[in-house]
Amino acid sequence: MSAILNASVDSNTNIEYQTISSTQSQISEEQSERLHDRISKEQLEKLHEAFKAYPDQQLGVEELREVLEEVDIVFNDAVYTRLFLKINQNHDFRVDWNEFVSYLIFGFQEEDPSSQKESLILPISVPPVVRKSEHRSAVCCLALLKVKSDQAPLEEVAETSNFSFGGEDSPEASGMWVTASHEGMMKFWSSHMEPIRTASSESSNLPHAVYVMSYAFYNNGKVHSKLILGDYGGNVRILSYSPHLRGPFQAKPGAALIEVVWSDVLKGKIPLLIPKEYINLHSELISCVYYSLHMNALFASAEYRNTKKYRGRCPGIIMVSYGDKSNFRIPLGVTTFFVAESHNIVVTGGPDTFVRIWDVYIPTEPSAILTGHNGGIVMVFVQPEENKVYSVDYQKIIKVWNLQEHTLLQTYGDLVRLIHHTETDLTYYYHSHLRELIVAGRKLISIKCCPRVRVDLTDGNTHAAPVSVVLYNRLFRNIVTCGLDSYIIVWDPWTGRRKIIMKSCHTKMIYGETIDIEITAACFDPLEQFLLTGARDGSLKIWNYNNAVVIRNMSIQPDQEVTAVIWVVERILAMGWDRQVTEFNDVEGREYGDPKKWPKFHTDDITCGDVKLGEGVVTATYSGEIIFWKLETGQPYRRYSVMEPKRFIELKLSDEEKQMKRSKRWASRAPHSGSHMMSHTGSHMGSNVDQMSGSRSRGLAILQGQEEIREYGVNVPISVQAVLFLQNRPQTLHHGSVFISLDTGIIQVYSHHQRGGYMNEFLAVHKTGDCVLTMATDRKNRFLFTGTAFGYIKVWYIVNYCIPEAEKIHVCMPRLRLDFIFLRKETFLTRAKRVVRNQAEPLLVSSYKGHLKAINSISFINLPKIIITGSHDYSCRLWTQGGRYLGTLGSVLPWTKLSPFERAGDDTHVYRLPPDIKKVASSTTLKVISGLQVDRPMKRPDKAKTEEKEEDTAQALETNDLKKLFDRPLKDPILGKHFQLPGRSALDQRIDLDTTQSYIPVYTNLKVHPSEELERLPTPAVISRVQAENYLHQYLPVEGKVDLNDSALNIKLPSRRRSDRTNDPRNMRTAKTRGDMGLGHRSSHTSQN
C-alpha cells in the first residue's frame, strides 16, 4: 500500500505505510532487520534492565531505538521501521518486554529443522493395490529376495533423501517377492507384484520345526552373513558363512541339489558353515528373530499367554550381545518387534495391544508406550528417516505414530474393507527401499507408506490441495500461501524453507465431525502485520500468522462463499455469493459491532473485487455486471455490463433489496400507529400489497423465464473472472485504470471516473476455451502479469496502453529483448505470437506454460523481479520476470538461494524445466524457461535454381567418380606382396569350468566357429533319370469289389502310353513282353476257374 498513514498514539510517533511499500525504490534495504544474529546474552540482559527503567516497562518508537543503540545495535530509518512493526504485535505502537522476547522466540522457532519435517498429507494417502495371490490356499509366508541389504556399516551410511529418480523399482534395487502356502507351493513376483515363476518346497528334518527365520548381510561382503532360525522349542540357531564366491552355496558338478544334515554342521564336517546354538533361549516358541550386524547382537522374542504360569514377568524379548543377555520384560510377551539401529531403539508389539518403544541399552523400562489399538499387535516397523512408527493389530487396523512426539498421526482402516472378516491369519512384510507394506492372505495388498517423491515426474507439492491464494508480505519478506486444504503456510522464498504451517484454519462441526473448510480469499492489513482469510462457508478470520493465533472471527451470511476481501484503514470489506459488500469495523472498541451491509445492487453472485486506495471499489459478478463504488460512503456511482460495455445502465436496487426495505418500512410504522385497529389494518394492507407485488413479480419471472428458455444460447451471460486496479493511474476520463478479465479470454479496460467508462479490450489468450483467472502488476504499472485456466503465464507491457497520447513514452525494444527472450525472432511464427500479430497494444513480451492446471493466483515481488504463481495442481512456483524457472515451494530438491535485494536470474546460468512441464512444453515454453535459443537461419531458395543446382551437383559427382577410376591405374600387386594364412597355436588352450552355479555352462566355454554353406555338386543325368522313373505306374487299382478268396494279385491292363521314342527297339520289346505277361496271367486265371 503506497498511501501514507500517521498511525500514532501521540504526535511524536509517525509510522507511514509507504515505509513498508515496495514503491520506495530509493531506500537502501541491503541491511537485514533480523535481531537474532546480532544480539548476545549480555546485550539481552542490558535490554531487560532498560525496559525495567521505563514507566509501565513500555517503550515507544524512538525510545526503543535509543535503547538498541546503547547496546551497539544500529539500523537505518527504513530497516528500523520494519523491525518495530514486526515487534509491535498489539498495534498500539508501544513495545513491552513480553512482545520483545516473543519476537525473538518466534524467530528462533522458524530456524527449527523439525518444522520442515511436518508432512502436508497423511502418511498413507495413496489407494492400495490389490491382486489375487494365485495360491490354492492362503499365503502363510512372505519374504523378499533382495540384492541390497537394509543394514550397512556406519561409515557407509549416507543421509537418506526423501526423493528418488525413479530407478528404485528395478529388480537389482528392489528385489523379488516370494510367497508360499501350506501345500508347499512357492511363487516369485516382481517388485510390482507381477508373477514370474512357480516352484515347490520341501521341509528338512530338524530337532524342532523352524517357525521363523531372518537373514542379515552387508552389501560389501566383508562381514560374515548370518542366517537365523527360530523354532517351536524356543531355540535359536545361527549359521554364519562368508559370502565370498557364494560361500557354501556353490554348485558341485554332477549334483543338482546339495543336502546338509544338521548334525554334520554341528560336528564341523562342512567347514564353510559356522553354527551357533542358543538352546532354550525362550520357553515358548520363537515369534520373531533379528540379528544386528552393527551392534553384533541377537534379538529374539516369544509370546507368553499363560498368565498363571508366568505372572507377567516373562522375558518378552531377549537381546544377546557378546554372551550377555538383556531381558525386556513385557506382560504376555512380544509378537513382533523392529530394531532401528540408527536411533538405537527397539519397537515392540504383542497381545496386550500396546506399542512400546525401548532404548536398546535400557531394557528395564520403555521410553514410551503408545496406546490406542483394540487388538493384539501383529506387525510393527519404523521409518527412521521420517520419524514414524507403523503398527498393525489383529483387527487389521493400521496406526501411524510420531516417533519423537509419541503422538498418533493416522488411523488407516481400509484393510477391514478389503479383507474378509473371517480371514485373520495374515502375513506382513515391509519393504524399506520401496516404502511398501505387503499384506498377504487370499489376496496380495500393497500399501504405500510415506512414499518418496519422484523428482523425474514432479518437483513436489506446496499444499495437499489446490492453492487458492498467494501473497507476498513486504514487511516480513515472506510468502503466504492458502489452499483449499484449509492450510496457511508461511515460506521463506530466499532459502525455500517452510517457516510456519497452520492446519485446519477454517472448520465447522457436522454431525459431531470436524470438517475443514476451503480458504477462498485472503489479504493483509495496511501495515501487513496481520492476515485476513475468507472461507467457502462465509467465515472470516484475522490471524497473527507469525504465531498462528486467531485474533478475530467474523462472518457474512452463512454458507455463502467469500470470493474477495479488502482491508483498508479502519475498515474490512468482504464480498461473495451473498451479492453484496459487507463492511466490518477495524477500530479499537468497535470491532464486535454489527457489520454494515452495503446496498444490494447486484443480481448475481460476486466473483471478484478490488480497491483503489482513497478513491473507489469495483465489484463484478458471474453474470457480467460491474459496479463502481465510493470507498468512503459505500454508494455506487456507475454500472456496466461486459456484454454491452458502452451502454448506460441505470443503478436500481434488486427486487430482493426492495422487498426487504418495504418490509422494514412497514415494520417500523406498526408500533407508532395510533390504535391497535389502525396498526392491524395497516399490517393487513401491507400484507395484501406484498402478496400482490409478489404475485406480480412471480408472473413476470415466469414470462422472463420462458423468454430466456426460448432464447437460450443467444443471451448466455459472460462472467467476470478477475478485476485489477492500477494504483498509479489517475482518475481521469482518458486513463484506463481498471482491467476486467472475462471468461471468453478478453480483458476489457475501463476508466473509473464518474463520466468514464469502457475504453478498449484485447485478447489475452492463444487457445480456444482459455481465459485469464488472475492478474497482477508491478509497483509502477509497467507490466501486467496474467495467469490462465490452461496454466499459461503471460506478461504484457502496458506503459502506453489506454493513456493519453501526450503521456506515451518511447519503447526500447532492444532492452526488452534482452530481458524477455520471447521477443527474439524465430524462423517460424509461434502460436502465441500469431494471435497477437495484429494487436499493437498492449505488447506481449512473454508467454509460457507454467503449470499443468489452472493458475488461481499470481503475485509479483518488485525488487528481485520474481513472479509467484499458485495453481490448481497443488504447487506454488517462482519465476524470474523473463520466465526462468526458480523452483517450487515445498520441493525436496536443493533450493537456489535468492536475495531480496538483488534481481533474480543470471543469463549465464542454464535453468532447468519443471519435470511435468518438460513432457508437454511447446517450443516457445522450452525457449522461455530454459533461456536458450538455437539460431539456425533457414534460407528459402528458388525452385528453379534448386533444380539446376541439383543437376550440376549430380554431374560433378559422376565426373569425380570416373576420374577416380580411370585417371590412376591400380598398383601391382593388388593383394600386396604376400598373403599368409594364420598359423595354429602350439599350446593347448585350457578351459576353466565355472562350478559356482547349480549346473556347468559348457557351451559358454567352447569356441564355436560360424558354419559356412558347402558348394553342392551337380547331379549326373543318369541319376536324375533313375530318380524320375516310376516302376509302379502300371499297378492301378481294380474297379469294383475284390474277392479276397481269389488271387491276391489283381492287375488291370493299363492303357497304352505314347512313348517319346517309338522307333526305339527297346521300347517295342518291353511293350510286347508286358503284353505277353498280361495275357499269360489272364489265361492262367481263366483256366483255374
Swiss-Prot record:
Alphabetic keyword roster: Repeat, WD repeat
Disordered: annotated span: 661-684, 1049-1089
Pfam families documented for this protein: WD40
InterPro entries named among the record's database cross-references: EF-hand-dom_pair (IPR011992), Quino_amine_DH_bsu (IPR011044), WD-EF-hand_domain (IPR051242), WD40/YVTN_repeat-like_dom_sf (IPR015943), WD40_repeat_dom_sf (IPR036322), WD40_rpt (IPR001680)
PROSITE patterns per record: WD_REPEATS_1 (PS00678), WD_REPEATS_2 (PS50082), WD_REPEATS_REGION (PS50294)
Biased amino acid composition, Low complexity: 672-684
WD repeats by residue range: 155-199, 207-249, 329-368, 372-411, 462-501, 514-553, 601-641, 767-806, 850-889
SUPFAM superfamilies for the chain: EF-hand (SSF47473), WD40 repeat-like (SSF50978), YVTN repeat-like/Quinoprotein amine dehydrogenase (SSF50969)
Stated name of the protein: WD repeat-containing protein on Y chromosome
Lineage of source species: Eukaryota, Metazoa, Ecdysozoa, Arthropoda, Hexapoda
Name of the gene this protein is made from: WDY
